[in-house]
Amino acid sequence: YNLSVKMDVETSHSRGELSVFSVIPYDQLAALVVLGESIRNDVVSDDLVAKAHKNNVPVVMLDRYTKGCYNIEFDYEESFEQIVRHVIEYHGCHEVNFMAGFRENNFSEQRLDTYRRVMKENGCTVKEEYIAYGDFWEIPSRAAMEKWVQEWEAGTSRRPEAIICANDMMAIT
């Protein structure tokens, strides 16, 4: 089972995608593996976990700590730090903007902290105008990018040498 739309806003598409979870044959499962950060909806994730537990099915939760589950969390910080260092130290870019995910989202905040730290270590300036929030998704990241472009064209903000994005969806947008 997989989702391809954001679950944090209810739409006809998200309702349709959520319906796939109603046909999970819990009585036939040896375990349920949930990609918590992909679903990004606590109500949906918690409902899946509750139904699995009701049917005595163990749950493996990836990237979202959930009580009563086998939780697997990855260390994305080190690999993201390598990306930021590569752009700054290998390519010599010192005017770098950052496209973060959601505000107050653990993944986004960790990556933003890493960006700020590595920029500072390399003597690079970080201003709030160099940071935008693209919500890990195409439409918000496109809107943030268009705002930056308008500022650059108007001469109210400097054009960066590089833009680092917190995830691949925002980078390819």
Which functions belong to the PLM regions below?
Residues Y1-S12, L18-A31, S38-T173:
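Bacterial carbohydrate/catabolite-sensing allosteric modules
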